Amino acid sequence: MKALVLGLLRVYRYAISPMLGRNCRFHPCCSEYAQEAVERHGAMRGGWLALKRVGRCHPFHPGGYDPVP
């Protein structure tokens, strides 16, 4: 499961993300955060952390440095 999620993230980061441009308000960007969260915590918990992060990534949030716990 973990390998599948990481593979999907890599496809997004290298095939889709360059076409969309860098729009993330955080550092590291949301896809880097998701990859690190899944590597550290596994597919379930890391995926949940990534979803929470993407939910915070909007124009009304100040953004900034937000490392993976």
From Swiss-Prot:
GO CC list: plasma membrane
Main localization (coarse): membrane
Keyword Membrane: yes
Location within or outside the cell: Cell inner membrane
Membrane topology type: Peripheral membrane protein
Keywords (A to Z) from UniProt: Cell inner membrane, Cell membrane, Membrane
Coiled coil keyword on record: no
Function of the protein: Could be involved in insertion of integral membrane proteins into the membrane.
Protein name: Putative membrane protein insertion efficiency factor
Organism: Aromatoleum aromaticum (strain DSM 19018 / LMG 30748 / EbN1)
Lineage, opening ranks: Bacteria, Pseudomonadati, Pseudomonadota, Betaproteobacteria, Rhodocyclales
